[in-house]
Amino acid sequence: MLFIQCRLIMRKILILFAVALIGFASCADSKQSITITVTNPLALERVGEMVEVPMSDVVAKLKLADTAQIVVLDVDGQQMPYQVTYDEKVVFPATVEANGTTVYTIQPGTPAPFDVVACGKYYPERLDDVAWENNLGGFRAYGPALQARGERGFGYDLFTKYNTTEPILESLYAEELNPEKRAKIAELKKTDPKAASELQNAISYHIDHGYGMDCYAVGPTLGAGVAALMAGDTIIYPYCYRTQEILDNGPLRFTVKLEFNPLVVRGDSNVVETRVISLDAGSYLNKTVVSYTNLKEAMPVTTGLVLREPDGAVVADAANGYITYVDPTTDRSGANGKIFVGAAFPAQVKEAKVVLLSEKEKKDRGGADGHVLAISEYEPGSEYTYYWGSAWDKAAIKTPDAWNKYMAEYAQKLRTPLAVAY
């Protein structure tokens, strides 16, 4: 009898053990994860640099349902901000020491709310501007309504930013375009021009009210880094965009697709340019991918920074893949500080140089002195990728040397990207 009781007890223990194993396996499945190993091959620390993992790989490895959510964890198990982009990539900021490796984890879970850092908007009420920003600065491209008025704004414009890391452009536009205040200004101009001017300055985004401003001049130039085809030594200037589509709008990446009216290139009047521009949180530079449809032959393509002083501080370094310029801003007294502009290139640049304009050309280019250009070769059917952007000496980057160091290191990082394995 005792033997039978012992057998029954052992059987119950085995059943309980089997149930426990099944429960453990089920728990393990619920915590299934992907280990993301990020390796930095450079002797430079990489801080907050976006890495990308295809969402399709995440779904396949985690066997996720369509409605499932994920979290990205650092080595301490703390959640990282991330974004799933329009082209189905999980992007998140990685920090990796020089010649080092950092491990992150992706697993099913409910993500914490993240602050929106990179974002933008289409402003039909401001002549079709598309304006976007991150924690470091803002940018804009001009649209068809501006072109229809006959204004010539070919290049990218800039908004400086300091004293905040939060989005400011929407509030700047709202104040600049406030209809009640605009009506009041129009009324005051008839009776009290001084008061009208004071109110105009109070709402203008061309005046610094403590968080930044637009004090950059563009006009009929390449502005802060537009790319253009070249016929010999002649730049074929693009005009304002024709259509826009915002593809990503934060929290970590803003992406917009711009398509342009046909260009006349060597007698062909049907060459259409498309740009896809992306700005990531924590970066001074926008990634831009340019393509030209209906182009029949290889041509030089250049990225340019407009020069507003012929003897301004310029770096044109083709070998190391970057160009920079110190812009005096629209106020040459120095009250607005200096804007540092630059472009960096992941592929080899054929030539980088300063090209000054003749007196006649200056008049046609709104008084600009010239451009610093980085020239490459564009093959029909390909994509031309480069990065452009700016910093302000009233914010974190104070000197031309600091900006040139940032740009040189950025170009190095483009040519030696982080390695992502999983």
Regions found by a protein language model. Give the residues of each.
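Polysaccharide-binding surfaces and accessory modules of carbohydrate-active proteins
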Residues: K31-S33, P300-S358
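Solvent-exposed N-terminal domain segments of exported/luminal and surface proteins
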Residues: T110-D233
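Acidic, contiguous internal or C-terminal segments within carbohydrate-active enzymes
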Residues: T243-V301
